[in-house]
């Protein structure tokens, strides 16, 4: 039974455990199926099943919290205008996605946050370490050290002892996960251990779509039912990933930032498919609409979109009058701020509003 995925150190009677394995009953099945159906599939008594359901329900129920006890914490982006746009910065205890096409500055933004989290509370940091989980290439440490050298320019009025980080890489844990199996192992098992050993304030996953695209892409040579099975499997894996990261973020008061890839968005004839179709409605939560010159759509679909709290987009734009290219930092949706655009630049100091 998969109860260990939801509750740590839960004692499970071996007899009942084997009965659940033979009956292929999951934790979700135990909590949702009719008691007579559970009896039929596990051959356990009704009293045993009801007792188990009560125990697990108590362990999984959310902790009561009144609105007066809720406190919002944020991690600074390193730029005053971006922080104001986000109503404080990157929210702590939530999942934040940063999406954009190749070369838009996603990795730059993530590395910048790895430095910001090391800053003291007085500067909007958390005085904690960062975890950088990469799925495509290792962390660009040369660029990380360059950003650290230019921190005095970003904070000219701050006390130098607060902003000079001699060894910025010492408080950035990094690992390369080239496949989905290693990624799941790191996040499910090793990351919680690291949280207990050190003060972690930020987790970066760059990027979330890479391994899922590689291992669960559609195989047109196989049957349609196999494709549907892959889609369902990917949806379950994405839900589990989001739940694990969200739980860690909430328990340890950490910010979680996930970089996501995008693909081209093909405009459709909405008169034919209707205004309530997903293609039309997705303009309001994808980050691009049909008025953009080259509309994109974030990877991993609606399942992933429903699992993140905040979506940010880095958009490349070219001025038709001057033919000059620029970048836009867009708040697509967030519980803390409305949809807004800020023009940004990338330089030696990192990403800043301009």
Swiss-Prot record:
Gene3D superfamilies: P-loop containing nucleotide triphosphate hydrolases. GO terms for molecular function: ATP binding; ATP hydrolysis activity; ATP-dependent activity, acting on DNA; ATP-dependent DNA damage sensor activity; DNA strand exchange activity; double-stranded DNA binding; single-stranded DNA binding. Belongs to the RecA family. It is found in: Nucleus. GO terms for biological process: DNA recombinase assembly; DNA strand invasion; double-strand break repair via homologous recombination; mating type switching; mitotic recombination; reciprocal meiotic recombination. Keywords: ATP-binding, DNA damage, DNA repair, Nucleotide-binding, Nucleus. The keyword Nucleus applies. Involved in recombination DNA repair and in the repair of gamma-ray-induced damage. This is DNA repair protein rhp57. ATP binds at residues 100-107. GO terms for cellular component: cytosol; nucleus; Rad51C-XRCC3 complex; site of double-strand break. InterPro entries: DNA_recomb/repair_Rad51_C, DNA_recomb/repair_RecA-like, P-loop_NTPase, RecA_ATP-bd, XRCC3-like_C. Pfam families: Rad51 (PF08423).
């Amino acid at each position: 039974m998969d109860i260990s995925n939801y509750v740590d150190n839960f004692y499970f009677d071996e007899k009942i455990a084997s009965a659940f394995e033979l009956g292929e009953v999951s934790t979700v099945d135990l909590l949702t199926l009719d008691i007579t159906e559970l009896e039929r599939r596990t051959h356990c008594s009704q009293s045993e099943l009801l007792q188990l359901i009560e125990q697990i329900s108590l362990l999984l129920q959310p902790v009561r919290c009144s609105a007066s006890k809720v406190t919002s914490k944020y991690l600074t982006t390193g730029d005053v205008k971006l922080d104001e746009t986000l109503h404080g910065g990157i929210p702590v205890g939530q999942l934040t996605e940063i999406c954009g096409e190749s070369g838009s500055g996603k990795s730059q933004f993530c590395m910048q946050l790895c430095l910001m989290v090391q800053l003291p509370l007085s500067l909007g940091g958390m005085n904690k370490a960062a975890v950088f989980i990469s799925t495509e290439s290792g962390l660009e440490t040369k660029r990380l050290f360059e950003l650290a050298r230019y921190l005095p320019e970003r904070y000219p009025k701050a006390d130098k002892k607060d902003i000079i980080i001699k060894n910025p890489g010492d408080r950035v844990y990094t690992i390369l996960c080239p496949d989905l199996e290693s990624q799941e192992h790191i996040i499910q098992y090793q990351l919680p251990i690291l949280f207990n050993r050190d003060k972690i304030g930020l987790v970066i996953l760059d990027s979330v779509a890479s391994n899922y695209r590689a291992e669960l892409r559609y195989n047109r040579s196989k049957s349609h039912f196999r494709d549907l099975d892959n889609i369902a499997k990917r949806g379950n894996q994405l839900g589990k990933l989001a739940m694990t990261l969200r739980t860690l973020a909430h328990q340890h008061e950490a910010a979680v930032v996930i970089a996501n890839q995008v693909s081209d968005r093909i405009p459709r004839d909405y008169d034919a498919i209707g205004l309530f179709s997903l293609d039309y409605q997705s303009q309001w939560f994808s980050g691009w609409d049909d008025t953009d010159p080259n509309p994109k759509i974030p990877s991993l679909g609606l399942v992933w979109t429903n699992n993140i709290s905040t979506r940010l987009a880095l958009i490349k734009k070219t001025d038709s009058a001057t033919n000059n290219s620029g970048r836009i930092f867009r708040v697509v949706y967030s519980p803390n701020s409305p949809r807004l655009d800020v023009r940004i630049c990338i330089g030696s100091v990192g990403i800043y509003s301009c």
